[in-house]
């Protein structure tokens, strides 16, 4: 049918159309068509309603500002998951240091900056609970009755037991074997050998399967009918049995040649009530020690090697320090001892700068067990919203992100640049941040695992702060320093590309691909 676009023609055309039958046709539409329409339109309506509700819903004056999000339930999870640092920095500019975001149905209040970290990490465990935030992730991997699968006061005692086994008197046992070109690093002693001999290829596979339980998916869902979850559970059982068998053999033969290792140390420990650690608790603590320490050290080593390969000048200074301190007349090197690490400023600066730019854990979360007011010095409602304070409500979550302070250009010069020399300036920001973090001359707090500096008010917190500060901090410096020194003694490093960006799709902050490093041996034996 042809017609022109005049008003009279349109009126005649529309008058002849059977509009009255339209309703009847809709009524006769099959149910499958209705289902398709509902399936297509329901998400759109949900998104529109969610956006509208955020604009018109009444909000308490004490509620922190909420990050606008289009997708209900999912909230800001996609943006946060792909680029948490960019997400936090953008929200910080828009909302300030305190704001709330929705992450897959969880209401999470983020507190940024030095004061924000102090608010969360320095808070009381009765208010900010780590167990509620992480037990669903750690318990299937570590095992029952340890770490976050027990009351906080019990966990603090367990940290004390492990810390006792990691005292500096045991550090000299870790040293480099220079008798072969491999330069292997290991702990000495017959009973450590008993454990090492069990670390064969099958154990490596168990470790890999158990490591598969430390992913963002596992953080979101503790149990799913997936093969990776089944492998995780089987590996946890076999690895636990491995350690329990060693413990039982030692208990059955107490007169055998002994050497002080971590298992032996844990066997001697007792809780405050006098109860000794049970065999499965020792086994699960050994798994926790293995898994927790390996991830963070591996990440730090990877970033250190990448940066040394990209900065030949720093690598050369590091090598020269090794020559001056440990070089022999024939061009070889003597082995490093623990005390030597205290006198290697270049190596120390390299490790500290790597931890500043690439802290293994960039976000720390807690479950809120009671309503907690936010200090006005951190953030407060504007005069238009009221004269009170923000309150983080019970049964939600709080999140601190120390990396935001560690990369804050208002604190650090060239904040995003890896520059170890900043740590050699005794009057600089880095040295001051380190003094605040270690606070060697200040007041110490005993959270239950020995007196430590609080460290929550420093802009540099690579090992956490407060009651959950990492107890393996000194051991990590020893381990990383020994491996880096062994590496630069043997090879020259070059990076064919730029230093990779952060991979935020892993729980630990690892580099993205490609991350290949070229090397050349310094000498051939």
Give residue ranges: language-model regions.
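Cytochrome P450 catalytic-domain "roof"
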Residues: 25-32, 81-109, 130-150, 159-189, ...
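Conserved cytochrome P450 K-helix/beta-meander segment immediately N-terminal to the heme-binding cysteine loop
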Residues: 358-363, 382, 400-450
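Cytochrome P450 heme-thiolate monooxygenase catalytic core
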Residues: 130-136, 173-301, 317, 338
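Cytochrome P450
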Residues: 3-43, 102-109, 170-184, 190-201, ...
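N-terminal membrane-proximal hinge/A-helix region immediately C-terminal to the signal-anchor transmembrane segment
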Residues: 2-144, 148-157, 164, 172, ...
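Cytochrome P450 I-helix active-site segment
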Residues: 66, 257-261, 309-363, 368-370, ...
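C-terminal helix/juxtamembrane-tail motif
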Residues: 508-525
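Cytochrome P450 heme-binding "Cys pocket" and the immediately downstream C-terminal segment
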Residues: 312-314, 455-469, 473-511
